[in-house]
Amino acid sequence: MSLPTYATLDGNEAVARVAYLLSEVIAIYPITPSSPMGEWSDAWAAEHRPNLWGTVPLVVEMQSEGGAAGTVHGALQSGALTTTFTASQGLMLMLPNMHKIAGELTAMVLHVAARSLAAQGLSIFGDHSDVMAARNTGFAMLSSNSVQEAHDFALIATATSFATRIPGLHFFDGFRTSHEEQKIELLPQEVLRGLIKDEDVLAHRGRALTPDRPKLRGTAQNPDVYFQARETVNPFYASYPNVLEQVMEQFGQLTGRHYRPYEYCGHPEAERVIVLMGSGAETAQETVDFLTAQGEKVGLLKVRLYRPFAGDRLVNALPKTVQKIAVLDRCKEPGSIGEPLYQDVLTAFFEAGMMPKIIGGRYGLSSKEFTPAMVKGVLDHLNQTNPKNHFTVGINDDLSHTSIDYDPSFSTEADSVVRAIFYGLGSDGTVGANKNSIKIIGEDTDNYAQGYFVYDSKKSGSVTVSHLRFGPNPILSTYLISQANFVACHQWEFLEQFEVLEPAVDGGVFLVNSPYGPEEIWREFPRKVQQEIIDKNLKVYTINANDVARDAGMGRRTNTVMQTCFFALAGVLPREEAIAKIKQSVQKTYGKKGQEIVEMNIKAVDSTLAHLYEVSVPETVSDDAPAMRPVVPDNAPVFVREVLGKIMARQGDDLPVSALPCDGTYPTATTQWEKRNVGHEIPVWDPDVCVQCGKCVIVCPHAVIRGKVYEEAELANAPVSFKFTNAKDHDWQGSKFTIQVAPEDCTGCGICVDVCPAKNKSQPRLRAINMAPQLPLREQERENWDFFLDLPNPDRLSLNLNKISHQQMQEPLFEFSGACAGCGETPYLKLVSQLFGDRMLVANATGCSSIYGGNLPTTPWAQNAEGRGPAWSNSLFEDNAEFGLGFRVAIDKQTEFAGELLKTFAGELGDSLVSEILNNAQTTEADIFEQRQLVEQVKQRLQNLETPQAQMFLSVADYLVKKSVWIIGGDGWAYDIGYGGLDHVLASGRNVNILVMDTEVYSNTGGQASKATPRAAVAKFAAGGKPSPKKDLGLMAMTYGNVYVASIAMGAKNEQSIKAFMEAEAYPGVSLIIAYSHCIAHGINMTTAMNHQKELVDSGRWLLYRYNPLLADEGKNPLQLDMGSPKVAIDKTVYSENRFAMLTRSQPEEAKRLMKLAQGDVNTRWAMYEYLAKRSLGGEINGNNHGVSPSPEVIAKSV
């Protein structure tokens, strides 16, 4: 046996390493938190890494988890060694195939990063809701508790499945295990060969379907035999626990790590025992070890085998002295007599004829913390004479009173473990740097190391908290650090937003990235921060990491700067050695992105320590120390102050059950209260240079730049610094004009500056919008913004929507989202909310737009002064088109019903009023405004009628005002998982609008390839470059002939985007808008992304067109191209995107081959669209359509 090899990696990689080696076919589909297992598999296959039998596994991405399960089923039936990975809703889509796979006794292992199921809300975080929904499929279910166990059980589960023919579901906790970095011992291939028997593999192959030995499976059976046939599998399941134990024993002999299906630890004469499975067992073991050392007779039973459930083995694993048992489930089954594990344990003891006191409890739903204090709380609760059954721990249930008490100050943290916490921003690289730090510590010292990273669901601007532990012994602490020796705050703004120093221990180190120097920083610390520093005797260090990063050319990414500071202060390695290791990790991490990126990071490392200063700490707090600002102002609504404000302050765990809505319904228009201050620079308007075109407003991803025209009298109480000028548009003569920025909501992306066409003639590098540091401007611009909001909005009926400058005066009803800085999707959502938001219903597919659009604590969908605004909901990823169609048919029916009821009141209202309402076509803004007035008039006249008929009418009266239904999602939904439903809706003819924000990848799950991904682009799940062309969704929709279709790119042509939205809404049927949306996953400069869209259109890589079937009624061609012929080859534009450029570095010949094919795709597509657009309805070529000659041959020659 070879010497042990150690590596520091997370649970996903630990599992994928084994699953890859033991597979020939791997069917994948992305879903958080399991996606990295598929990503690793795809990357290794792209590197031609062989499996255990010397062949490279075939990795295939499917359109959904249902598709992946079907592919797995087919591959298994054909004799291949096959696996897949999933979680949550993805597992739900696999259930039908799982029943089949198990029923056919087909060996395989499905690896699941266990995650919550969407119920009253979606959650990407971990519990056992998903796997418990699979417990009746016939799959064996094995639970691993740590990264090491996940690595080991990937092998044990597979070996047992081959030996028994029973497929296995191997699960581990999402995020807590899947994303936790741990130093583990890797399994050498000889151990895998020792456990995987050749005879089992050959038997599996021998059962394959083949025409050389034809047989039939998947029959339809009748009542005469189905029952008997179902019972034939009993011997296989009965033998499984014995076989598993044999495999575990052999594994222990080979590795020295010993497991049991039901493993007890604790006092040999324990009286109180906890039973549970998953990562919580590690915390429970740490706590039980601590308490038994103090003489307490307590214990823990780790359940590793959940299905088949071997009750006799579970009972026999416990000491005979046990009197009370608490069974903990990490899921909730509403309406059940108890959660699954509880019921199984209860049944096991009943059948054994032994009945200690057994109670059940719930813990840890959606990655809710499970700490030693809670474990002790459960054990203490068992000490009561009549302990509460069906309890919860870790929450305050003041509604049903299920929660039990515990002492949160109880701790089992060892003094030998160094504990560090880092507060960062999703876009600053903190998490990535800390993952590298953990690897350096784990692999270059004798320490064991653990890293865990807490994210919220916002995009790249989210708060991240990294928890690092390292010490001389294995680390079982699967919970967040509450007592930190080292605290680093990588964003100055956090100090005034939440309690950064609360976990710091006495005498600890505090490192802060600050815009202030060492001499001035103390007086800038908030009063509470100063007091904590003094009270806890903290050593304080500061660096202006933003300046260091900017000077090195790294922009906002301060990660390597702060990482260097950490190693310099922590002393875990000699300083020079640490810096050398950091540089090695930089090369490894950024090498694929180009040597320039590597050199920038190394430059930052080299210049860091010269800018790191220790801060002298006074003995008392400064008299003029600033106070921490309130999380939300006093004038915010009560629910915002008392509930959402707590979540914003990172105190959501303290909210009681009664504070939260029972059905998941939340108010809109709440992002206005969350001032994140994440933009270090904000745009500053120069009215003397501005041409008042509106471009900066229309492209702003977060609706923080707005324009208004108003009468001069409105300026009477304007702040001194409030800027304005005379309105230039002849429609607004005599009015004043202002462009104003919301300073605390701006993310500092700089897109507005890049698109601004107005140049300062005296200083050519300046424009009408220029970036400036936010901090000095914050107070002044906050006052200006508040004043600006109080200015009246222009009358919507007076605006000419054919002009951008006019249209952008419409109030956005989508504002301040948590999307990435420079997001390419949100400008479209803002635009549609401006145009139709006051009458709009949104069905939003799961994806980026559902997360920044509907993630707690605040939501960007807003309301106007009348309280109207978009009504929004998310169902699932796969059913959004059908979900939105449900909106439409319900509205149509209720509108019809309202009309029927209205007619019955003709006597009270008069025929004229009834007729006026029913005959209003509502095709214009003015029509809709008039209809609202008429309907309101009717409601006023009928509201005092207390008849059932009147009350019924009033409940549906508002449906007489036209409602605009928008079905919104990304390309992963529209091109892949939801395409079947989308196609059905396209064929329905119903009046719905569909907006596909095409980022050409699965942006929400981290940038995996979809069928929208263009050929030659590198993405996750397409590590070797996507070999196939992009799906043409628009052309497919056009084949119906009665669907309005538009392909738009706001950065290429603003006016065409507006026109497409207006036409889509006006079209009396299905409309589909496909909107190019740049994304950070493209590896581009987000500041220049809008202008890059124009370059893509100029190259023909993206087409601008509108297909309006109504034109056919006029004898015109429905297809209108809104662009000229391609002007440049695509390789002159796409290589500014790293997703294309990186393949030229890793596989230059393959990159060249794929790029040539990609250019051919563009040429062919353009030629076809141009041909279609030039045809008249009679079939002849219309030579006067555009007057532009095609040039695909010229383009082809340049490639």
Swiss-Prot record:
Binding-site list for [4Fe-4S] cluster 1: 690, 693, 696, 756
Keywords of this entry: 4Fe-4S, Electron transport, Iron, Iron-sulfur, Metal-binding, Nitrogen fixation, Oxidoreductase, Repeat, Transport
Residue sites binding [4Fe-4S] cluster 2 per the record: 700, 746, 749, 752
EC number assigned by the record: 1.2.7.-
Co-factor requirement: [4Fe-4S] cluster
GO biological process entries: electron transport chain; nitrogen fixation; response to oxidative stress
SMART domains according to UniProt: EKR
Cofactor note: Binds 3 [4Fe-4S] clusters per subunit.
Organism: Synechocystis sp. (strain ATCC 27184 / PCC 6803 / Kazusa)
Role: Oxidoreductase required for the transfer of electrons from pyruvate to flavodoxin.
Origin: domain of life: Bacteria
Protein name in UniProt: Putative pyruvate-flavodoxin oxidoreductase
Similarity-based family: Belongs to the pyruvate:ferredoxin/flavodoxin oxidoreductase family.
UniProt catalytic activity: oxidized [flavodoxin] + pyruvate + CoA + 2 H(+) = reduced [flavodoxin] + acetyl-CoA + CO2
Gene Ontology molecular function, alphabetical: 4 iron, 4 sulfur cluster binding; iron ion binding; pyruvate-flavodoxin oxidoreductase activity; thiamine pyrophosphate binding
